[in-house]
């Protein structure tokens, strides 16, 4: 028999006039290799079919199951219960995003708005002919672009960001990472001055306080620390 876990889950439906924010406590018997995602499924299947949380892939790829796990933004599907020695686990929705219900938040609209704000697409003067082979680039450059493209938009870096909590319009590490991704892509013809117009202010790269919680919590281990520093140096050199 496994040990008994105490799971405290935040419950609240902002669309309901009678719902009030509160914690609901559940006792779950731990199983080998149990994840928080498995725990939440057990709770929903056994105790609370009304519990809301998001998931798709269950493999750390889609980023849907981001939530606060004992105060740390993490993916439920990649967090093992055995890592919590006292067996007490508190789950809350990610801050900085609109709450849908319980542990479910709207990251989609935020990331869509961020993508539009930083103009997250290739800017080129000539029209691309899709019938021709794509222009070749050096393998090292392609690998660097791919590395930054691994962002799964889970929202963990945004939830961990002190600046984002204080400044609603801050683009966050995800936005700054997206800018660097296009900055190093040789297919994009924008200049440093063009990027400065997008993120050269306190809601962009100069709002970052370099606390680097984003770097610490990123489930894909993206090089956020070095890329934000690179972007800051680039933007400082513009003026």
UniProtKB/Swiss-Prot annotation:
[3Fe-4S] cluster binds at residues 161, 208, 214. Its cofactor is [2Fe-2S] cluster; [3Fe-4S] cluster; [4Fe-4S] cluster. It catalyses: a menaquinone + succinate = a menaquinol + fumarate. InterPro entries: 2Fe-2S_ferredoxin-like_sf (IPR036010), 2Fe-2S_ferredoxin-type (IPR001041), 2Fe2S_fd_BS (IPR006058), 4Fe4S_Fe-S-bd (IPR017896), 4Fe4S_Fe_S_CS (IPR017900), Beta-grasp_dom_sf (IPR012675), Helical_ferredxn (IPR009051), SDH/FRD_Iron-Sulfur (IPR050573). Its EC number is 1.3.5.1. Its main location: membrane. It is an enzyme of class 1 (oxidoreductase). Pfam families: Fer2_3 (PF13085), Fer4_8 (PF13183). GO terms for molecular function: 2 iron, 2 sulfur cluster binding; 3 iron, 4 sulfur cluster binding; 4 iron, 4 sulfur cluster binding; electron transfer activity; metal ion binding; oxidoreductase activity. Part of an enzyme complex containing three subunits: a flavoprotein (frdA), an iron-sulfur protein (frdB), and diheme cytochrome b (frdC). Belongs to the succinate dehydrogenase/fumarate reductase iron-sulfur protein family. This is Fumarate reductase iron-sulfur subunit. The lineage of its organism: Bacteria, Pseudomonadati, Campylobacterota, Epsilonproteobacteria, Campylobacterales. The gene is frdB.
């Amino acid at each position: 028999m496994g040990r008994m876990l105490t799971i405290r889950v935040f419950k609240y439906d902002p669309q309901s006039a009678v719902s009030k924010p509160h914690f609901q406590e559940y006792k779950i018997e731990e199983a080998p290799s149990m994840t928080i995602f498995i725990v939440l499924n057990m709770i929903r299947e056994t105790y609370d079919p009304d519990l809301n949380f998001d998931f798709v892939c269950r493999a750390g790829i889609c980023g849907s199951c981001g939530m606060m796990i004992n105060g740390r933004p993490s993916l439920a599907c990649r967090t093992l219960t055995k890592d919590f020695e006292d067996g007490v686990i508190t789950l809350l929705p990610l801050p900085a995003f609109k709450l849908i219900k319980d542990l479910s938040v709207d990251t989609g609209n935020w990331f869509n708005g961020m993508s539009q704000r930083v103009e997250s697409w290739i800017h080129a003067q000539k029209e691309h002919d899709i019938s021709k082979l794509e222009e070749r680039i050096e393998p090292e450059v392609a690998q660097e672009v791919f590395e930054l493209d691994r962002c799964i938009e889970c929202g963990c870096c945004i939830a961990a960001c002190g600046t984002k909590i204080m400044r609603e319009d801050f683009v966050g590490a995800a936005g700054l990472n997206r800018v660097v991704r296009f900055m190093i892509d040789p297919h994009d013809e924008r200049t440093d001055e063009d990027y400065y117009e997008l993120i050269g202010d306190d809601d962009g790269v100069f709002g970052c306080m370099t606390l680097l919680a984003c770097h610490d919590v990123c489930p894909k281990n993206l090089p956020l620390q070095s890329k934000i520093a690179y972007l800051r140096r680039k933007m400082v050199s513009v003026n």
